[in-house]
Amino acid sequence: MALNNKVSFVWSSTVVWLTIILSIVILIAYIGLIYGYINTVPFKIITLKSIIILVVTVIMVYAVSLIPTSLTWSEQGIHIDKVIGNVFISKSSIKSITVITYNQLNNPSRRFGSGGYGGYNGLFWNKELGLFTMYVTNKKSKLLLIQTSDKKYVISCNSADDITKLFNTANM
């Protein structure tokens, strides 16, 4: 049976607005830092501004690299395309796939990642799951909870029921 489907991540209006507003604020701050950098003479201030510009750049590249763009599932496994890079979860490593809602996560705490900029992406933690990787661009959509032998993933997906049904039917 040939199984290969692809869906795009759908952003909620909250994620869209958070991303737009934060991008504008960061861009204005970045322009201000660069403008101040160009017009600053004392070496100590130039060094401090250089460090701030470098840190802001690294944080922005990291935040953007986490943003998921599409999800593909096939007989080999589940593939998450991101703006920079991708994640592959092989079928053989998947122990279970279930459909959950965001409310079932009981307000997970962010350990390292984005709390709304481009989605809720990165490492999160809650009492029930422990540490897990989350790629959620819409808290109101159904979520896939994928558990492997060493990791847990929570992924927003409009096709969560279909993916769960197909993988569970394949006797994983």
Residue ranges and their predicted role:
Residues 31, 48-50, 138:
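Short hydrophobic/aromatic-rich motifs at helix boundaries and adjacent loops
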Residues 56-98:
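Conserved beta-hairpin
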Residues 1-44, 151:
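N-terminal membrane-targeting/pre-transmembrane regions
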Residues 144, 150-172:
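Non-cytosolic head/periplasmic domains of membrane-anchored proteins
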Residues 27, 53-57:
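Hydrophobic alpha-helical membrane-embedded or membrane-associated segments
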Residues 10-13, 81-149:
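Non-transmembrane, membrane-adjacent beta-strand/coil modules in membrane-associated proteins
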Residues 1-6, 74-78, 143:
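Short, hydrophobic/aromatic-rich segments at coil-to-beta transitions
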Residues 41-53:
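Hydrophobic alpha-helical transmembrane segments
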